[in-house]
UniProtKB/Swiss-Prot annotation:
<dbReference type="GO" id="GO:0003735">
    <property type="term" value="F:structural constituent of ribosome"/>
</dbReference>
<dbReference type="GO" id="GO:0015935">
    <property type="term" value="C:small ribosomal subunit"/>
</dbReference>
<dbReference type="InterPro" id="IPR014721">
    <property type="entry name" value="Ribsml_uS5_D2-typ_fold_subgr"/>
</dbReference>
<dbReference type="Pfam" id="PF00380">
    <property type="entry name" value="Ribosomal_S9"/>
</dbReference>
<dbReference type="GO" id="GO:0006412">
    <property type="term" value="P:translation"/>
</dbReference>
<dbReference type="InterPro" id="IPR023035">
    <property type="entry name" value="Ribosomal_uS9_bac/plastid"/>
</dbReference>
<dbReference type="GO" id="GO:0003723">
    <property type="term" value="F:RNA binding"/>
</dbReference>
<dbReference type="GO" id="GO:0005737">
    <property type="term" value="C:cytoplasm"/>
</dbReference>
<comment type="similarity">
    <text>Belongs to the universal ribosomal protein uS9 family.</text>
</comment>
<dbReference type="InterPro" id="IPR020574">
    <property type="entry name" value="Ribosomal_uS9_CS"/>
</dbReference>
<protein>
    <recommendedName>
        <fullName>Small ribosomal subunit protein uS9</fullName>
    </recommendedName>
</protein>
<dbReference type="InterPro" id="IPR020568">
    <property type="entry name" value="Ribosomal_Su5_D2-typ_SF"/>
</dbReference>
<keyword id="KW-0687">Ribonucleoprotein</keyword>
<keyword id="KW-0689">Ribosomal protein</keyword>
<dbReference type="InterPro" id="IPR000754">
    <property type="entry name" value="Ribosomal_uS9"/>
</dbReference>
């Protein structure tokens, strides 16, 4: 590693430029051409921690993945407690299944807003984005091909004045 010397001025001495002891420390950033097995540890093959944000309808999911055993914590609850419906559990797990990374990461998520389906969609997007961030070179193409990195921007259309719903008009009587 590269050694760097730093001189720091001593406080309280006015007018004089007095410097404290010279401190030498080793930089943690490897200098070009100085890569070792320790500096590359965790870059290839090992799971990396990452974070991602997902949105769907009115739901927002903030997701962190850390190397682990496949545990889920969503707003302090397990996946089965938060999403009792198996369809939603499968939807949220899809990015891991496509990348064949089941059980290699623990997921910690905070979800707010929207309903159950929107929250599941937001969580899936957040998980996919965090997996993409963890290893862009290996994961991005697979996740993109499966459509997991695209935000589904469909939302409820607003109700218009003079109509009963967004598009439903009141019954028309000719006579």
């Amino acid at each position: 590693m590269a050694e760097t010397t730093v001189e720091t001025p001593v406080e309280g001495t006015e007018g004089e430029e007095t410097f404290a002891e010279v401190t030498t420390f080793e930089s943690e950033v490897p200098v070009e051409g100085e890569y070792t097995s320790e500096s590359l540890a965790g870059r290839f093959g090992d799971p990396q921690p990452a974070a991602g944000l997902g949105r769907r309808k009115n739901a927002i999911a903030r997701v962190r993945i850390v190397p682990g055993t496949g545990k889920w914590k969503i707003n302090g609850r397990t996946l089965e407690d938060y999403f009792p419906n198996k369809v939603h559990q499968q939807e949220v797990n899809e990015p891991f299944k496509v990348l064949e990374l089941d059980g290699r990461y623990d997921v910690i998520a905070r979800i707010s807003g929207g309903g159950v389906s929107g929250q599941a969609g937001a969580l899936r997007l957040g998980v996919a984005r965090s997996l993409n961030e963890a290893d862009v070179d290996n994961n991005r193409a697979t996740l993109k091909k499966a459509g997991f990195l695209s935000r589904d921007d469909r939302a409820v259309e607003r109700k218009k004045a003079g109509l009963k719903k967004a598009r439903k008009a009141p019954q028309y009587s000719k006579r």
